[in-house]
């Protein structure tokens, strides 16, 4: 374990957090709010810890995957705790656990909230709450990699630990260049959505907050009804962008480099759009009697399907009142999630495709025991290591899911609330059903249950293993 480089990286996360908080201070100044002190205090704390840790570069830059996982997990814990300080000091969320819940939900792009009334919050707090989605969407360590040569030739171990999906690949030979490309695409798409929303007459502050949530696939709304009170134009634009942010970003790089055929032949993306289209049509047919016509049912269905499968969590209607078939489809989409290499959460479409192909292979072996069958995705043979890691991931995922449902059941809420609460947090979605539906929140849970759900949100965003490593004694051995 290279403790020095880990503390150096975590120190830079403290420094970055201080820089990030400058924007909500500017927001407070613009709107004449008194919450500047809360953010200034948080900045002083962050710099007071971060600057000493980054004053001297580490001499030993050997950095293995275990070090990367620990650095990433600790960095996200640091983001969560320091990010909660303004909520507590401003009085917006007085209790530390509630504040950490809200902050973790923001950075992990979950969008689950303990707040029943968000419209009364100061603009600076609302801005910070939404901005955490954008920061966490692509990953703060990936952002750090795009700025600083942190770990010599060992960048990939850091990127692999934070990036979602069963495997992580470089777009170009240099990892730092890959990180810059990813953030360039991320920023470019963010600016595009801002422009489109402004053209539709959406106020600038609302535009920024909605876009931060869309880009990070987060879902914190600044209205009590999420996006329900905005125009159809705003909802349609947001639908398109949240679906686009759920696509593997490598496809956009291929398009930018004019490799159109390769981009449109990515198997995961074809499944992704196929699942979305099928779900939209089924739900639109099932809910058509609840709207003024099929066109409106289709539009509302498209928004909710896009929001759930990408794990954004915005809503334009109370789908808690939808028929059982529609709600069942949405719950299934919670688990499927977005594409690997996107800002979305969930199990990921690539893993679902892999499981389906593995199941088909096993079925074929029953019929033809001597046949030699290989699993291929995008014309490439999937390695046994990838299959093994996928199976282990799903096994641990199931254990955490069941354990979390059992623990929060101590609060004596109904099964659907408990089940979808864990599904919504472990898959980084936000709203569930019943008490935690799109018009509800997580405030009713005990602090024990909120702590469990905080763990689930972090585990879901970090794909479980980096966070779990913190709890193993062998992780902390020097050699």
Regions found by a protein language model. Give the residues of each.
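Membrane-proximal intracellular helices of multi-pass ion channels
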Residues: 1-479
